[in-house]
From Swiss-Prot:
Role according to the record: Transcriptional repressor that binds DNA upon activation by RAS proteins signal transduction to initiate transcriptional silencing through the recruitment of additional DNA-binding proteins, multisubunit complexes and chromatin-modifying activities to establish a platform for DNMT1 recruitment.
Name of the protein described by the UniProt record: Zinc finger protein 354B
Signal peptide from the UniProt entry: none
One MF annotation (Gene Ontology) recorded for this entry: chromatin binding
One GO-annotated biological process of the protein: regulation of transcription by RNA polymerase II
Family: Belongs to the krueppel C2H2-type zinc-finger protein family.
Originating species: Homo sapiens (Human)
Entry keywords, A to Z: DNA-binding, Isopeptide bond, Metal-binding, Nucleus, Repeat, Transcription, Transcription regulation, Ubl conjugation, Zinc, Zinc-finger
Superkingdom: Eukaryota
Annotated KRAB domain residues: 14-85
Region (Disordered): 76-102, 320-340
PROSITE patterns xref list: KRAB, ZINC_FINGER_C2H2_1, ZINC_FINGER_C2H2_2
Lineage of source species: Eukaryota, Metazoa, Chordata, Craniata, Vertebrata
Locations listed in the record: Nucleus
Length: 612
């Protein structure tokens, strides 16, 4: 009879307000843009999860605003003409505002005790209290926290003006599942009314808690769901069922394939709302957001210094290791220094447990660590059979071999041009977008990437770190040094398929191939004249602008081209490098030698006529 009464008792239904995170206007306006973006993501995901559980309720106004990309606040005028906040206008929401005010008092108390505080709705706390009371009445209810916990952490990166202290926010959404036990402890009947769509839990009638009961026999890692275990086991078996149709690269998981396909399509769905920069992976966006928030969440417990990256903390800790070598003993596993990290940082370390002792970077697998360590050791086991060039990774060799085969699997959607690597395609796309986010502090020139900015700045500093060991000549870029070294070795790895002519660099081959194709992609906007090379277009545009950037230090004469300046300087130096093979006469310019040859040709033709 008691059991029947227990079954008839109404359930505590989960509503949106139970999991909603509410802010007052003062709290909201003090949040950084990156914090607001993450709050928006959390709230929308909470709403989607509730909808997927089959709960029926009208869409909250705050969700409609967030879906439209607006702030969860609307300033409206009431009948008295006084401004009020739109999403707090109803009596129900006004009550929620009062709850928030009392909640702020609790926050102030927590801050005085230097405790972290959580923005969780008051109704959620009341809901948990109800469940606790029912448990105390021996109703044998259990709450299972499963599947999704989302944490918004902005550790000491946002100053709260009102409270006068730094704080971090946690927005935690926990899906709460209720299971009613029967008298027999080995069986349980799942309450199906509230969670009809949660099919993966309905099929598991023996679950009592969210324990990880599916264990991998190879590495003993445990999982909550059997499907997660099966995905994980593919890492050991090497099974890769998901294949890219573009380049035939295979992956063990469909999510990895989807991410990879963005390299071909160029899709970048993760956009920074601060600067508009787009990324193909959410992890890349998270890293980028740190540049705006200046978040430094890795703190040294020895001296209190903070770092935005784990590798920075690790390198810093080596200073303390020299002072106290017995205290710090960095090893192969990242857990060897995890004692110096906070709880949230240790969560990241569980995912990346292999640590590089040289630079502090962490990796998910020992194989990834071995690949990385070749950067430090200089080991290059993968050699090209065509030209003998060696590489540290097989992927780099495959990419290099495309130079010899002519394969270009990465194609630009705008102009159809093909490329051997995704990095080259991304660099090319900037031509169409015109995006230049990096400015030089010296001359104000805008550049498309941080790496090109660093190389450009060396023009002003005069730094040339790449030095040739044969002749001692120095260069600003490593690529320029590699091309130069081919002059000494005689290596010409780039071959034209039309005429078999070989070249030292890929750009020279590309320019040469336009002779065969007749392609002239560089067009002057002033007169419409087209050119096969960008350098030729730049030189031509100086005719319209009148710019003459090359100046003779001796007489002050200026020139449009560097070659014209070099030829002119020979007037002052008296240098004559061009010699006639027929009579030995010397010339300062090649064009003068060419004209001189015509004299000998005419003489030869006259002699031939006389003999006839």
């Amino acid at each position: 009879m008691a059991a029947g009464q227990r079954e008839a008792r109404p359930q505590v239904s989960l509503t949106f307000e139970d999991v909603a995170v509410l802010f007052t206007w003062d709290e909201w306006r003090k949040l950084a843009p990156s914090q607001r973006n993450l709050y928006r993501d959390v709230m929308l995901e909470n709403y989607r999860n509730l909808v997927s559980l089959g709960l029926s309720f009208t869409k909250p106004k705050v969700i409609s605003l967030l879906q439209q990309g607006e702030d969860p606040w609307e300033v409206e005028k009431d009948s008295s003409g006084v401004s009020s906040l739109g999403c707090k206008s109803t009596p129900k929401m006004t009550k929620s505002t009062q709850t928030q005010d009392s909640f702020q008092e609790q926050i102030r108390k927590r801050l005085k005790r230097d405790e972290p505080w959580n923005f969780i709705s008051e109704r959620s706390c009341i809901y948990e209290e109800k469940l606790k009371k029912q448990q105390d009445k021996n109703e044998n209810l259990q709450i299972i926290s499963v599947a999704h916990t989302k944490i918004l952490t902005v550790d000491r990166s946002h100053k709260n003006v009102e409270f006068g202290q730094n704080f971090y926010l946690k927005s935690v959404f926990i899906k709460q599942q209720r299971f009613a036990k029967e008298k027999t402890p080995s069986k349980c009947e799942i309450q199906r009314n509230s969670f009809k769509q949660n099919s993966n839990l309905l099929n598991q009638s023996k679950i009592k808690t969210a324990e990880k009961r599916y264990k991998c026999s190879t590495c003993e890692k445990a999982f909550i769901h059997n499907s997660s275990l099966r995905k994980h086991q593919k890492n050991h078996t090497g099974e890769k069922l998901f294949k890219c149709k573009e380049c035939l690269k295979a992956f063990s998981q469909s999510s990895a394939l989807i991410q990879h396909q963005r390299t071909h399509t160029g899709e970048k769905p993760y956009i920074c709302k601060e600067c508009g920069k787009a990324f193909s992976h959410s992890a890349s966006l998270c890293k980028h957001l740190r540049t705006h928030t200046v978040e430094k969440c890795y703190r040294c417990k020895e001296c209190g210094k903070s770092f935005s990256r784990r590798s920075g903390l690790f390198i810093h800790q080596k200073i303390h290791a020299q002072e106290n070598p017995h205290k710090y003993n960095p090893g192969r596993k990242a857990s060897s220094y995890s004692t110096s990290l906070s709880g949230s940082q240790k969560i990241h370390l569980r995912k990346k447990s292999y640590l590089c002792n040289e630079c502090g970077n962490t990796f998910k697998s020992s194989s990834s660590l071995r690949y990385h360590q070749r950067i430090h050791t200089g080991e290059k086991p993968f050699k090209c059979s065509e030209c003998g060039r060696a590489f540290s990774q097989s992927a780099s060799l495959i990419q290099h071999e495309r130079i010899h085969t002519g394969e270009k699997p990465y194609r630009c959607n705008e102009c159809g041009k093909g490329f051997t690597s995704i990095s080259r395609l991304n660099r090319h796309r900037i031509i169409h977008t015109g995006e230049k986010l990096y400015n030089c502090n010296e001359c104000g020139k805008a550049l498309s990437s941080h790496s090109t900015l660093i190389i450009h700045e060396r023009i002003h500093t005069g730094e040339k770190p790449c030095k040739c060991k044969v002749c001692g000549k120095a260069f600003r870029q490593s690529s320029a040094l590699i091309q130069h070294q081919r002059m000494h070795t005689g290596e010409r790895p780039y071959k034209c398929n039309e005429c078999d002519k070989t070249f030292r660099c890929n750009s020279s081959l590309s320019n040469h191939q336009r002779i065969h194709t007749g392609e002239k992609p560089y067009r002057c906007l002033e007169c419409g004249m087209s050119f096969g090379q960008s350098a030729a277009l730049i030189q031509h545009q100086r005719i319209h602008t009148g710019e003459k950037p090359f100046k003779c230090n001796t007489c002050g004469k200026t020139f449009r081209q560097s070659s014209s300046l070099i030829a002119h300087q020979r007037i002052h130096t008296g240098e004559k490098p061009y010699e006639c093979n027929a009579c030995g006469k010397l010339f300062s310019q090649r064009s003068s030698l060419t004209n001189h040859y015509k004299i000998h040709i005419e003489e030869d033709s006259l002699k031939a006529d006389l003999h006839v």
